[in-house]
Amino acid sequence: MTLALQYKRILLKVSGEALMGGQSFGIDVFVADRIATDIAEVRAMGVEVAIVIGGGNIFRGVAVASHGGDRVTGDHMGMLATAINSLALRTSLTKLGVETVVLSAVAMPQICESFSQRKAIGYMNQGKVVIFAGGTGNPFFTTDSAATLRAAEIGADVLLKGTQVDGIYSADPKIDPTAKRFDQLTHVEILQWGLSVMDTTAVTLARENNVPIIVYSIHEKGGLAKVLNGTGRFTMVSE
């Protein structure tokens, strides 16, 4: 896709798994540094950047429920995992000289500030990167839903989801080599066809608030800037 894109404010969703690199658990510091370098590159282009990070590299709340435990407690543990990842990415960005603030949906004043919409927008207007930790602050909601919610709250021009592949496919291309890749889709098509790019709540929230979604591979060095320049490979989701 070669459509030229012009975005002033973006929200980037990074999965926790992306931070693992080749590991089976935790954070690969070199991967975190590379992702931070991509973010610093687009920040230098004048783009305002907010980020939501998942926690799946450390813990998933559904894992507790699947073993007979309390889902709410499990999701609270997952929220803490997103805070760990947020602090790690802030560290990587700070090393590059990028001013970064972590705002959490769950109060932890000795570690980071609590989220408020006005505070987030204020920091972005100052040129700082803002990382949203703690998901939505409520159980039963994914970090994809949190990303869509925050994108709507801060008035982001687009929500970018960095994934393991270079767009949205009809099936997992790592499993099905015949899977069809899409250049463009609508929110309704994702919902109707049951495409597994985001959960239904996240896609519906994006549709209702006119938040376009771009899905691209987070593993390509410099890939974020390429997408924003319209030269990368990605899938655009809009109405």
Curated annotation (Swiss-Prot):
It comes from the Bacteria. Pathway: Pyrimidine metabolism; CTP biosynthesis via de novo pathway; UDP from UMP (UMPK route): step 1/1. UMP binds at residues 55, 75, 136-143. Its EC number is 2.7.4.22. It is found in: Cytoplasm. Pfam families: AA_kinase. Inhibited by UTP. Gene3D superfamilies: Acetylglutamate kinase-like. ATP binds at residues 13-16, 56, 60, 163-164, 169, 172. GO terms for biological process: 'de novo' CTP biosynthetic process; UDP biosynthetic process. Keywords: ATP-binding, Cytoplasm, Kinase, Nucleotide-binding, Pyrimidine biosynthesis, Transferase. GO terms for cellular component: cytosol. It catalyses: UMP + ATP = UDP + ADP. Its main location: cytoplasm. GO terms for molecular function: ATP binding; UMP kinase activity. Homohexamer. Belongs to the UMP kinase family. HAMAP family: PyrH_B. Catalyzes the reversible phosphorylation of UMP to UDP. This is Uridylate kinase. It comes from Bartonella quintana (strain Toulouse) (Rochalimaea quintana). The gene is pyrH.
